[in-house]
Amino acid sequence: LKDGPCPSYMDTCCLSPDRR
């Protein structure tokens, strides 16, 4: 999963941000 703002709200990192 990429880190940072996503271009689309349907992005996986937007739905479930894996920043831990």
Swiss-Prot record:
Keywords: Hydrolase, Immunity, Innate immunity, Protease, Secreted, Serine protease. One of its GO terms (molecular function) is serine-type peptidase activity. It is found in: Secreted. One of its GO terms (biological process) is innate immune response. Its EC number is 3.4.21.-. Belongs to the peptidase S1 family. This is Putative serine protease. It comes from Galleria mellonella. The lineage of its organism: Eukaryota, Metazoa, Ecdysozoa, Arthropoda, Hexapoda.
